[in-house]
């Protein structure tokens, strides 16, 4: 396979015939968040809400959100594909269909979904399709996965507002996928809160420089 064929393959979602089989057993992780000590997989306090964000390499994206007041816990993992309980190595092949994502569990009384969405839009480039900077492939696509219809509508409205802001600067179109949350598979323990364990580690986040105009209240 030539370089160009390999590149083109990485930019395409795999067919059902190509998808790796995965496994029944979940990938093991620590029980608690390395930074906050809160339960990584629950149970979480009553009233917490969830959202999944994919914005390139999940290391930097997770750190972005765990630092936000009102965010109870974060975790990195894989979602949006077909392979059950994939490994990192499998996901990197592009043959699972999954994107690298961050699970954000938050208290809506302290931080709104719109505030989280503003960070999402401003801190990566949502116009790059199946890549994010030098990270190339379907694994790094921009996604928002929501857990109810109301939150999905909020996310879609924010996308429309940010699309207009980008267009006014000659940028776009937005390629971010917004859907109902699919199955979320936790990534390996060494990926969880990676930049807290490795402060000098890689962080590929880079925004467009365009501010998000959405109102920060619900």
UniProtKB/Swiss-Prot annotation:
InterPro entries: Met_Sox_Rdtase_MsrA_dom, Met_Sox_Rdtase_MsrA_sf, MsrA_MetSO_reductase. The keyword ATP-binding does not apply. One of its GO terms (molecular function) is L-methionine-(S)-S-oxide reductase activity. It is an enzyme of class 1 (oxidoreductase). Keywords: Oxidoreductase. Its EC number is 1.8.4.11. SUPFAM superfamilies: Peptide methionine sulfoxide reductase. GO terms for biological process: cellular response to oxidative stress; protein modification process. Belongs to the MsrA Met sulfoxide reductase family. HAMAP family: MsrA. Has an important function as a repair enzyme for proteins that have been inactivated by oxidation. Catalyzes the reversible oxidation-reduction of methionine sulfoxide in proteins to methionine. This is Peptide methionine sulfoxide reductase MsrA. It comes from Brucella melitensis biotype 1 (strain ATCC 23456 / CCUG 17765 / NCTC 10094 / 16M). The lineage of its organism: Bacteria, Pseudomonadati, Pseudomonadota, Alphaproteobacteria, Hyphomicrobiales.
């Amino acid at each position: 396979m030539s370089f160009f064929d390999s590149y083109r393959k990485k930019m395409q979602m795999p067919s059902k015939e190509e998808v790796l089989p995965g496994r029944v057993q979940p990938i093991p992780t620590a029980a608690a968040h390395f930074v906050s000590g809160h339960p990584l997989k629950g149970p979480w306090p009553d009233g917490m809400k969830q959202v999944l964000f994919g914005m390139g390499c999940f290391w930097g994206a997770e750190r972005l959100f765990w630092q936000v007041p009102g965010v109870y816990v974060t975790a990195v993992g894989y979602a949006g594909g077909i392979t059950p309980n994939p490994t990192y190595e499998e996901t990197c092949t592009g043959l699972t269909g999954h994107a690298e994502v961050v699970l954000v569990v938050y208290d809506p009384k302290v931080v709104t979904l719109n505030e989280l969405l503003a960070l999402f839009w401003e801190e990566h480039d949502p116009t790059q399709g199946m890549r994010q900077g030098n990270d190339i492939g379907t694994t790094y696509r921009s996604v928002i996965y929501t857990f109810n219809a109301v939150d999905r509508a909020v996310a879609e409205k924010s996308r429309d507002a940010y699309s207009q802001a980008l267009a006014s600067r000659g940028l776009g179109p937005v390629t971010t996928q917004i859907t109902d949350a699919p199955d979320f598979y936790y990534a390996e323990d060494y990926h969880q809160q990676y930049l807290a364990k490795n402060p000098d580690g890689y962080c590929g986040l880079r925004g467009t420089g365009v501010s998000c105009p959405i109102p920060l209240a619900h």
